Amino acid sequence: MKKEPKIVMIYLNNAATTLFKPPEVIKAATISALSVGRSAGFDATAERLSALREKLLKLTNARDHFVVLTPGCTFALNQAILGLAARLPPCRILVTQAAHNAVLRPVYALAKRRFPCAINAADEFGRVTPTARSTARTSNQKTGNNPTPKPPYEAADNGFSYGVVPTDEFGRVTPETLAPHLTPDVKIVVISHMSNVTGGIDDIAAITKLLRSRGIYSIVDCAQSVGIMNVDLSNIDIAAFPFHKSLHALSGIGAMIVREGIEMEPLVYGGTGTLSADKDMPDFPPERYEAGTHNLPAINAALAALDWLEKYEEEIRGNLDYIGKRLYNGLYDLYPKVKILSCDNPGAIVTFVTTDTDFDSAVFAQSLYDHGFVVRGGLHCAPLMHERLGTSLSGAVRVSPGIDTTETQIDSFLLTVKRLISP
């Protein structure tokens, strides 16, 4: 029986996770995995952790901040949103239509009282103290004020609420479009630096300047931007990003950049290697937010990735820009059968639909897979963005080349799309 020739897959889903990992990264992770594990308390490990934090602060120009290492970007965003809210009196949180579910779902959970925040236990400056929490608990016990638990998804009564700020068609907001939504009860605004659907980029410097002038905390989701462009986080309060995307390191590690002086409740409690006799977590960062054993192979891989990125940064970004424009222009030439949803400066994200009335992004993505191309169909974990685009039912096809994507591969992809949309 004659065997079918094996299709060599071309990976174009780098916005989800980058396929290419530099040899230095693989080597660092392998050596670390094969070595005797050492906790953060050992000098050599402490030096590696300190070096990684310092490199991240330099990369993001965040000198007045500290770095919290997390199991990933989703964890970091949960820690930022829920941990910060737990230190505030009941308030309103704003997200944008570009928000990823890693932002939306923690906010929804908070508003539906599915996260234990310290309600009505703040001082006059909005700070929650152990004494205030204890007083609130004692008062509730004396008065019998123990509210009956409400079933999931019922309207909240804890005072927290959220609002969605409309974006333009590329998922962008500006200080001018954001300002009317900044009512006195808004205390946290979560911004998506780069849309994972359209590649649209927000001016976070201008936005966070506005928020700071109003005394509002800023949380910035930098999952798509760090590594692919210069990112200046000097004005933000909290930012989160992973290492497995454009930093070309491993999954299982993320980072949270936090302005000095900002306090949050920890999301996870456990051993830190410091103050082990205390019943509570240490009250100083980053240990307060880093319970448990660090992912040392991923940390060593991240260090190697940052060294590699610093060496080849200009070459990497130049290639991505060229390949991204070639992809965008090629799909643009297929109009009107193909409609591009990305902005005309898409970086490495180009998302499209076809004008076929029966278009289904999952089916189209599968057809591309059958022809040897890995792309991403569906809603991309950004349902509000697809509502804005009118693609909630069909979804869209996202194509995200990487630094190792060639002109030949892009041209082959474009030819395949053309054949699939032809009658």
Regions flagged by a language model, labelled:
Residues 1-142, 146-423:
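Pyridoxal 5′-phosphate
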